[in-house]
């Protein structure tokens, strides 16, 4: 089966059919050949099974896998590259380190799989990206959970993979450890040209890390597309969660040193956001996340108040939220998508309806790396 991607354009084509007594996976995915693709869904939706198929660890009754032009599986041609010959890195929920080896020896073990001439990630780069240079002489027993996971990720990178698979790498960590490790994962996203398939059931993780999103339900892909497009679809489950949010990319357009306020120009030209942050070069692209719970609506422009960001918006559609007392409202701010979660009482009091003009008051903006 030839690749379906245009000449010169990288991509991943993953088609798997897997049958178990009580579960089946049947997906046909066309994914970007770079950046982070998140597989999102409830437990039992098929996320890990899909990852195991990519790694060659699950029996596939019918399938095809092309990683940027390199075919690892083609059932029709009876071709299946064994797992140990697939240039992939696999990061599990808990790092499986060799307890009798120090961190440096664990990392060097990952490098042994790759001939020196084929290494695309070196030791200095991996330790720098994950911030573990000071841990090289430590034994695994002396590492925190977050440190162990960072070492495990670095070891996976040192195999110089063409594909990095990450199966809920933060699931075993407490909130503080997750906060510590997320910036390092964002650095991988920004600085390495390795496609990542990231399994998670955390909307916040997906919003911070992913470029592309695949939603799985009962072994089927119910939606696949750019993250910003799928996050605002009210017919999909992510918009119904307590952490429902949008991710917006803009450009730094000014800084007020007296108040430490950075201005972000949003796509479309007129809408801007301001938030407390350090200065950034003019024109630098930045990503921010805005949670639906932090957006309120008004019919008249608020003139006085403590909320910095008030944007003119158009109501696009509304849908019931997970909590029956609330509704989700999809908005357009001069081309920038937003979500608001408001009470049904507020909807009725404001008599909101599609195509109405309103004002969105954004209480909080979080900058992503």
Curated annotation (Swiss-Prot):
The keyword Ribonucleoprotein does not apply. GO terms for cellular component: plasma membrane. InterPro entries: AAA+_ATPase (IPR003593), ABC_transporter-like_ATP-bd (IPR003439), ABC_transporter-like_CS (IPR017871), Mo/tungstate-bd_C_term_dom (IPR008995), ModC_ABC_ATP-bd (IPR011868), Molybdenum_import_ModC (IPR050334), Mop_domain (IPR004606), P-loop_NTPase (IPR027417). It is found in: Cell inner membrane. One of its GO terms (molecular function) is ABC-type molybdate transporter activity. Residues 7-243 form the ABC transporter domain. Its EC number is 7.3.2.5. ATP binds at residues 41-48. The complex is composed of two ATP-binding proteins (ModC), two transmembrane proteins (ModB) and a solute-binding protein (ModA). Part of the ABC transporter complex ModABC involved in molybdenum import. Responsible for energy coupling to the transport system. This is Molybdenum import ATP-binding protein ModC. It comes from Bordetella pertussis (strain Tohama I / ATCC BAA-589 / NCTC 13251).
